[in-house]
Amino acid sequence: MPIMKLRTVWLALAAGLLSACQHVPQAPADTHHQLLISIPDQQMVLLEDGAEQGRWPVSTARRGVGDEPDSYMTPAGELEVAEKIGDGLAPGSVLKDRKPTGEIVGADAPGRDPVVTRILWLRGLEARNRNAYQRFIYIHGTPQESLIGQPASYGCIRMRSADITGLYARIGAGTRVRIEEQPLSEMLRR
């Protein structure tokens, strides 16, 4: 019996050491920034330590608000930036499956609607947006810049390439994102 206990202890220690060796430390979450996105206003605000630092027009889903798989809707509520993708890419660089293709698409290129420039991949933090990450909900650049300011996306939050490039440089993974069916004036009062 003592040999069996010793073996169990050694196995537990070995498993713990292997687990520790496989852990990759993450950068600390960005707790200084927050993004507020108003669906009725089709606007986004960047807050840094509670103070407004930027405001941009966006485009949310043309089908409205929701989080069901394959709904093509924008999820509402509290989310966070789970991953940042696109460091150093030129404006208009096409990203397919989150990887650059080498193609660059100009603004308002006819018949083109790829994800371009940068991706901020969102993870839902509430029951009402729990599918956001698996649905590949991003804040990203779009070549359809003439549609910015009106609902036109398939669930993501679209921005002009110049705007997403600037925003991407200012925030980190872990930045909180709040998307609501309220005017920004109400969201900023909270």
Where does each model-flagged region fall?
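Exported/periplasmic cell-wall-interacting domains
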Residues: Q26, E68-S71, L89-R190
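Electropositive
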Residues: P57-L89
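Structural motif
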Residues: D41-Q43, E78, I119
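Bacterial signal peptide processing site
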Residues: Q22-V24
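Post-signal peptide N-terminal segment of mature Sec-exported envelope proteins
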Residues: A27-G50
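Bacterial N-terminal signal peptides that target proteins for export
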Residues: P2-W10
